[in-house]
């Protein structure tokens, strides 16, 4: 049976098309909603906080009174934090900065109970550095997920260049021989956003989403990213998952997290994964 892992997240550029403080206030609203939703809905299992622990500081700067509520959700494994301190452009920062970024992310995670997500998270980096597998392995991390670097399909499953891997899963190797499991967001990191609750819309939605994911996945574990840039929390997701499970008896839909997803992917990996070496440079924007 295929398993659809729906991972809720938001990708938070702290300053982009709006000034920092406007993005900051939108982020506070998102986090307020997330905490309230998780406390009220125990079926809303987990939220991936974009791989950057600085978001904890950003929230508590405005809502220091909510630290205990936030920390409990982190300690319970429901809000997943780290490994980085901040999501970086890997080619604009120095090598030492990339090392310190990981160290600072780990240190801050310890202040919130020590549940540090051991996933090298590069959702929207404009290319990935060749020594990332080496750095991650030194930190005890053996898996990386990323959106760019090996010609992902992008929005609406459109491929503009030849794909460089047989599957969305691959071996990614540094020059020193260090290797991690690499997982590409082959249908981007919004391929499970705004899941419909109503049956007819849900059927139309999942027919396409499942077909797109199966096209690239090497296992029966399918990844659906329930979020996008500055995406609010989908507060009715639990109902949407119940609808999907009723519609597709041959697929198990679960509200998941990267730790559980990767653990199950590793059990089913085929022997013919491609090995991608060094820098991942396709689909970068300079």
Name these PLM-found stretches.
Residues 1-284:
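Catalytic-domain carbohydrate-binding cleft regions of carbohydrate-active enzymes
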């Amino acid at each position: 049976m295929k398993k659809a892992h729906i991972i809720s997240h938001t990708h938070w550029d702290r300053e982009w098309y709006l000034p920092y403080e406007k993005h900051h206030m939108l982020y506070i609203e998102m986090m307020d909603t997330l905490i309230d939703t998780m406390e009220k809905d125990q079926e809303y299992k987990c939220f991936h906080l974009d791989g950057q622990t600085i978001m904890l500081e950003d929230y508590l700067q405005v809502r220091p009174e909510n630290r205990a509520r936030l920390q409990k959700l982190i300690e319970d494994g429901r809000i997943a934090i780290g490994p980085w301190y901040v999501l970086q452009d890997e080619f604009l920062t120095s090598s030492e900065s990339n090392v310190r970024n990981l160290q600072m992310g780990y240190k801050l995670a310890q202040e919130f109970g020590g549940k540090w997500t051991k996933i090298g998270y590069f959702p929207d980096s404009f290319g990935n550095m060749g020594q990332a597998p080496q750095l991650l392995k030194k930190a005890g991390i053996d898996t990386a997920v990323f959106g760019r670097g090996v010609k992902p399909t992008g929005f609406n499953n459109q491929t503009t260049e030849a794909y460089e891997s047989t599957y969305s899963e691959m071996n990614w190797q540094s020059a020193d021989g260090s290797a991690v499991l690499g997982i590409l967001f082959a249908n981007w990191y919004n391929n499970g956003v705004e899941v419909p609750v109503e049956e007819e819309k849900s059927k139309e939605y999942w027919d396409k989403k499942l077909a797109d994911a199966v096209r690239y996945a090497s296992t029966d574990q399918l990844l659906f990213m329930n979020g996008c840039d500055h995406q609010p929390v989908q507060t009715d997701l639990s109902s949407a998952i119940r609808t999907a499970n009723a519609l597709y008896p041959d697929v198990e839909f679960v509200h998941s997290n990267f730790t559980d997803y990767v653990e199950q992917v590793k059990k089913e990996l085929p022997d013919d994964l491609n090995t991608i070496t060094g820098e991942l440079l396709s689909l970068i924007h300079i």
